């Protein structure tokens, strides 16, 4: 445990003791937050604050603290005006030159995490100069020097910022003093282009030097810079020196290392950098010489020779032999030769390794025909390093003259300029042959190193087409065009100069059209990017399009491609530019006739040579239409139109090919389709039928009626002579101007006229399309079936000698006969109906039909037909001798049916399903709607169909009777399915020993079950997870399932699944059914005894787990009633049976399934008597024993009567109070239960004696039937004997005795275990040894009999001393037990608790006692706990034996009973009452309410706990005081937590404010006088006041300072008179407050400072003020209530002074409303003044005039003090005063200088008018003005003019203008008076 107030320990133990989330935050904070430095060393200074240091922390906000303020102070820095500090300034404040230290602590305000920095202050011991280099260049960037200070221990100071130093240039030992300033100088930062620290800038402004300076080199040489501390205290600290060298910035050209071949040479140049510019220096050099140094030879070199030779005059180096040497600068000044910054170069003399090529431009060996290139040959050594090629090297270069033309070549052969001539692949060669030696050497150095390079030459790149033009579309539709490329390597990179106009892909696809403009598309060769080709791309506006010539008529189904050209026409030049590609533009196709042509969407819009797009249209129906093509959504409407025609294909409908007729018969020939008359020239349409022999036939064109098709052409052809010929039909349009190439179609047929040769009679069948005909007519001698139920149509067909069927034989004479007219007959045997029918050949022929009438009888009949001759008068010659008759034998049968009609077949190869065909002709066609689902075998001999499944699916088996009249097939619906699902149906909760039925079904598709005959093919079986149940197969109940009987054997849970295997071996498993075998369901108690109105809850055990809902019912509801929770309430005396069932509803069947049930016997009684149950009546002192009230019988426990309504009250008393105390239960935790809960008490014995305990049980109402005989009270009493416990005489050494119950055990512990050897033994037992046993190790076991024993415990110490103690052990039975509660509850002084707080966790401890009240040290009792209800307490076993933990979850009283299961009489009952401990009641809380929460709970020290709220945005709560403001609707929970004692809560439901209630003090009103008090408008958001609970002073302060509830409320005011053009906000200032005293919101309305004009307007305003308020959170949600506040405006007068003569009378004009004017009080301060009564103005409403005059003018003039006229009003609390003065003599004749006329004269504008004009206008304006005001003025506004000159406000009565003239129009009336005149003061 970590105690409160314990110091923080910096260890990991603290981290792991935190909650996980706090530990995480702590860990994050520890890792993330740190200071910039851990330690700081500051210099001591006599000048405080001169050396600051900035301390920075990362993240968070910190509070800074210094532990040693006199040594180091710290000043936080706040950023952006916030209170958050992450930085602080350290300043050394030490005044003593000694080493001091301080610790800086930075504490993070949120996490309390501390950061530490150690700061030391010490004296500077020495200083030194720090520099990045010691060398400077002349006229180069300056060098920064910095001072570093160290203390005596060598530690470096953290900062020297702000300290003053003195920098100077000291004398060098090698230089004279006069040269010092010429070599180096010290710069200020302000003179250089560098940014110094801020403190340096400030110091330079004060002409001081800091710890950082700049130095700049002026000329070469050495210089010494010195620095010392300026402060006098450090005058003994030695100055620091640094020696700097100033050099020239010179370099060699080339400056890199050089590689030479033997004999080659190189010339060097020297340049220097001066002020950023490079200047070449001529030889010889002024200050330097060049030397070759450090010659290093390779193996085999001649030591006598150098590697290279140097010509100092020309700086040329010649390679002599292999090796390396250094070319270095040497300063001529000996003192400067140690300089390391002079340039040097290393020269390597090497052997050649190989050659290389380079080419320019492009650097690629992919060239272009016609281009000029520079080819360079490069030499490399064996290490691949490039060698310098001098002019004396010889390289031969070879190339093909066919491919290249050489234009330039150098002498050494390393540089060539060539031109590519033709394309192809060619190889160039180069060979290094020799190097010519100079210096008279005759032997050149020879080499033979060659290299070759393959070169690819391509033609120049050309892009096609030459340019691209695309239309711009405002919707951003892009065009895509692939550019064709010629030349180049074939691999290109593409780019666009303006990608906003055109973009190009890597494949050369150009996308453009979204933005107007032009761009250049560039294609670069990947092999050589310097080669490229380009085209221009234009995106222009489309403003013209046209459809190009095309074919205009076409057959239906054919497609016409219409080419479209689009243009951009220049508006100025009229030049038209055709677009390259506009195929991506969306085209809109419109026709004036819909459906003739449609857009062929599969057609590709593609550009062509003459057009940029095209549209494909398909002919869909005959007709003509005007097709208009336009661009969709374009900025200019571009369109073009053309006419198209579509026609059906020309064909011969009848006959299709050949027409065959008998002599004198007619064939009607029908042709259809072909072109229509061209709509623009219909006169050119033609059609014709031509023949070979005109005399053999007669042709007549048939004019079709209007209802026939218009494109059909019919001709009647009559046979005149026997024979055959060809007829040709042509149709089309002749060519014309408007249709130059029309379509013409033709078709041919043959016409035959012949004699009949044979006849055939067959029944007429309406066979379905696609089926074969009846096979019977093929055999003439076979019986042909016909229906015996319906009349049949017999058909006669006639054939010629070639077996061809005649189209028409109507000229023949026929006769019909029946052999058995009882079965069938003909009504007219000599006539025949000729019916045109297509017999399947596509040609319509005439057939002879005759109806055979049947009589619904089965049998056979012979039908015959005879041919008698032609119907004409004459017959043709040559009639054949063919048969003259035909016959057919018929059998009459019924229709076919299929059995069964529906079936579901399992998809398995071993399954064979048979379908029987009943009746019918016997000739059937078996068809299936699906072909691959089953294999169908038609067994003709058995008249059945066998189906073998092949694939799952649904099909319809159709049986067509081929030889009966077709009415439709006989069908069977068949479903072939695999196993889809296995279904188990059972009750999954089974009581042990019971049986349930298990039904197994196998489902196919669509949840259709299979028949159980397929189960053997499916290998269906059941599988159990465990053997707690058994299964037995039963007889099948139906053909679709298998049934099993399941028997529950053992309690537990198992899983049952059904398994099946399909044809592929795949296993299917049903959804596992979890089966629970549960113990028998039992209701507790078995018998319940109640008094009337008492409630007790039924508990249960056993049954399914988790337990389902128990349904309760009672047999007699007049005795008792039960609710759904099982709470039984007694009503009247009697018995009843309560039934409890666990049941559910089957989802499939909807039936109620009962898992288990039990019953309880309910007995409702009246209390006949009561008795006090005390387990013992003789007790020792200082013990406790519970007592409680019982009824007459043992079943009448406190459960029976403790929860009645009305409640019984229990009153206890004692005869002697000094013997024992009788206290209520839970008194140990300081609870004081009311009398209603005191059915149980605790006896505390105090002293020996005998006393009587009495209890009286009272009922409030005798009619409630609680007590027998309608008594109001019952009582009982018992005697208790208290005696002293046996003790030894020597009371200071009392031996302890161990008390154990029987059959228990106790482990003894001593204080010497582990330090000594401890053993124990039983010395003696009484009455025998079975009382107790001991194992020698301290474990005692009591037996089954009571008795006593003596126990000896011995300790053998290691130091040789033995200790022995002897104690007694008593084994006795347990007499009673007692429940006590924990923890203790504390309340404020003077307050008590009557119930446990809601939400509290409490512990019940069980203690056991013997028959005299002694407490047992161990226990062996099996306890049973019961509650009278389980909805108020959550209770369960504790973490220790014989303890119970409970949580108070709801208000109410729960009776807890506890008893020994073996001895039910040993029991204890306690009431547990739970109530709210937080006040006030929170049932009706509205938004805006302020709640002062309070509780009487405190801790043991009298301190309150901590308040918490679950949702702060609903109830904003101050956690310190417990006051909250309801800000939003919702539910929140307020918690009060006293750590270690109790945590309680209360739920707060905040309702939305239904309406705001406004009120005010009816005695108050609003006014606009400046000194008016604030008006208060009270607002309530709920039903009454908004303050809930009683507030403490601290809570009231929190409401005012922290919560600010007034921010919820917005106040508003508005004048009620809408004609008053003044907003109320200009007059009043309004804000909201919350009044804790009244408990409501207050709108304070105060008067603003007003102008005179505003006061004048308001003085006569007849208006009130509307006031209202709104909640910020619910603005606009609820209806707004407004309240009308009376408004009394203050009176107004603008006169402040009167100047009167002895005869003058002044008029005091006052504006105001009527009630104000009536309450005016006007009085004068001088007796020489007289004020007459007021009079109302007749012209202006609200104007009152008082007449003022001087009574004694002489005396008035002699007054020393001025006189006043005082005007006051009690309503508005106004007081105004007007000064009255006497006129002097000089002012008597100057009337015109005062008043309005003075203003007229003073204005230069008015002087332009004559006096006459003014006077003439005045009368007119007076009349007009008054008339106008009377009409429009609702609120009278009058301006009272001010007169006087030198004294503003003075007034002369005799010269004043009328009172209605206004010199300054008021605000409201200014628009009415501007047209009068304007007067300026």
Swiss-Prot record:
The entry's keywords: Glycoprotein, Membrane, Nucleus, Signal, Transmembrane, Transmembrane helix
Membrane topology according to the record: Single-pass membrane protein
Traits of the deletion mutant: Knockout animals do not show any overt phenotype. Males and females are fertile, with no age-dependent decrease in fertility. In males, spermatozoa have a uniform moderately abnormal head morphology, frequent flagellar anomalies and decreased progressive motility. They do not show compromised histone removal or nuclear compaction failure.
Transmembrane segments: 1804-1824
InterPro entries recorded: Big_2 (IPR003343), Ig_NUP210_4th (IPR056897), Ig_NUP210_6th (IPR056898), Ig_NUP210_9th (IPR056899), Invasin/intimin_cell_adhesion (IPR008964), NUP210-like (IPR045197), NUP210_Ig1 (IPR055096), NUP210_Ig15 (IPR055094)
Annotated signal sequence range: 1-32
Organism: Mus musculus
Phylogenetic classification of the source organism: Eukaryota, Metazoa, Chordata, Craniata, Vertebrata
GO biological process assignments: Sertoli cell development; spermatid development
Sugar-modified residues: 80, 344, 808, 1441
Tissue: Expressed in testis.
SMART domains per UniProt: BID_2
Cellular component GO terms held in the UniProt record: membrane
Name of the protein in question: Nuclear pore membrane glycoprotein 210-like
Family stated for the protein in its record: Belongs to the NUP210 family.
Superkingdom of origin organism: Eukaryota
Cell compartments where the protein resides: Nucleus membrane; Nucleus, Nucleoplasm
Domain spans labelled BIG2: 1078-1150
